[in-house]
């Protein structure tokens, strides 16, 4: 058996995918998030909670406005890391550790214990339990079912989890031989409410979330309303429903009741159109200002029509975002391409682009953004991202030009470029997307690019998902 010790972002799904491939008795324990950070807000002069990552995006905007200088920027950034541990926001680190618990791969309540807390003694209980699991032959394949993955998707909505969860949950399911379709993502996500009042979707941080009841309290609320599969097996040897008995919310300011959520219909929206077959948008981070400015225009509610400003990677964005020749205004959408699994390679967290400084000074803190890469789980903006197929494999994003009009209709779940077919076909003949792909910098990158799938499919390596239960057969002797 194996104890999987996890922490930030990709460490959790990577460890779980390896365990699935080996199919040994496996249990997850993570190092825990940092304690809550505190700092004086430069805008109000009052003390406020400061969350890992999220404060970076907020401080960047304050820097652009001229409210703070670079020294203050660094001070704010450092104040968000007051102790050992991973990010204390509901970024990808905390999200994926919560997902591990939702999948039934941790002992109940272990996902979000702050790193310095004495309750980290849960590691001892985890060690005892793995020995029992070996004796019981409780392998990971007996825990992970399609229903447990649906539980993970639903829990991700309720906690306001990272958009990266779409990639990682899909990848873990692929390794387990389970297909999760685009329609199943929305069916198990969008209709559910946001319950966890944790940054970036909310106000508080993970220390307060843990003290309010953490993941078990959130899942208990979902289970009470028949939104989870309670009979799935977990590493405790008990069903999920048995594990959640008696788990209640202890602070309704931090974890809302199902009937009184922070937001309704808070899950990911799945989009498609003539630019891509698949993309997602995280609705729980749509701010009131963004909603009023872009989604509540009279007669066009839920519809955005905007002029595309196209960037070829983050370097191009940073070089040109302040260029007055681009004439960027609030009727624009910022587009990032070349950021997918093949194009980057590996897919970069660069789609959450902020507007030019002169717009931020006018009070426009975010513009619609779109791209074939990812964003940080700590980001407080709602881009349309994970576009598949990406531009580097000939996806239609490769043929988009600055000045094209993009129409996004959230009601119809569509995203289209308004360019006539004749013009579009001519571009496909004239533009070579291969010329924009940067050379691989290592043999590993070359191998990765040849075998990786798209973000819609979890960005898994095609050859890797062929292998199942590899510990059942010993390798040949080579001496």
Question: Model segments located where?
Answer:
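Catalytic or ion-coupling anion/metal-binding cores of large enzyme and transporter domains
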Residues: 12, 18-23, 31-390, 395-479
